[in-house]
Amino acid sequence: FWAEEIFRALRGEPLLGSCSRLTELDMARSFQKKGRTPPAHDFIGPTGRAQGTESGVIWRRLHMEGRYRNLVAQVAVILAQSAWSYEAGKVRFGVSVDMRHRQPGLRSTGNLTNLIYLNMLPGLTVDDVTRDMAQQLADKNDGMLYWGDRLIRYVPLRMLHRAIQDEIKEKQHTGRYRNSGIISNPGRLSPERLSCDTFALQTGFFIPPCQESLPIFIAMAGTDQCVEILISMSRKLANGGRMAGLMERLQKGLQPS
């Protein structure tokens, strides 16, 4: 919404504006009263275990021409297969869902997203995963919250920072994580809405905000003509050619419409 509003201003068009103060917690509570209990942190990552001593996060972009149906499901299946190529273990992906569709007509600049979760099993097909996501959305699982979601805003930043650093060390030592990764698909960008007299959009992408306590974060965007896949991950999980290998696996495995 906010990017489209900027281009309305650049084109000299009337602005729509927004006075919404809705948060993702408020949005979730508005349509789902059930909560969820977190499973044990026992999930493996798509590129094996942490190696080396280099800290920090690295990101790369994969540009692919054409249109791709069921893109989230395709990516989830490929990432799961990659994880099992390194070791046996449980694989679960969080999929970011924009909850704005729960309130049609809402105009907000907030990040009104929550996660649904895909528990991957060997033999699951893209169609299986697609049906699972559709059923979870029908059940309104995108509004289910963990108890910690309600409390984290009250945790002092210093305490939160220390907890995150401790978790990074633990997860990278054990090779077992809260999730195998996060997959986000904001959808196709509209060149018409994101262009003006002096700028014509050809493609666009989002750099996913990965943390070192998470094996991988993938964000996908693009237009009707192409898809952009952005991958971010810890340097300890990307080194040794593993990130490049995963990108090659995605490039070869994704099937266009």
What feature does the model see in each segment?
Residues 1-63, 249, 253-257:
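Non-catalytic, low-complexity flexible loops and terminal extensions
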Residues 8-16, 81-91:
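Secondary-structure boundary elements
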Residues 59-61, 84-257:
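Acyl-thioester-dependent acyl-group transfer interface
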Residues 68-69, 126:
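Residues at or immediately preceding the N-termini of alpha-helices
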Residues 69-78:
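Domain-scale recognition of functional cores that engage charged ligands
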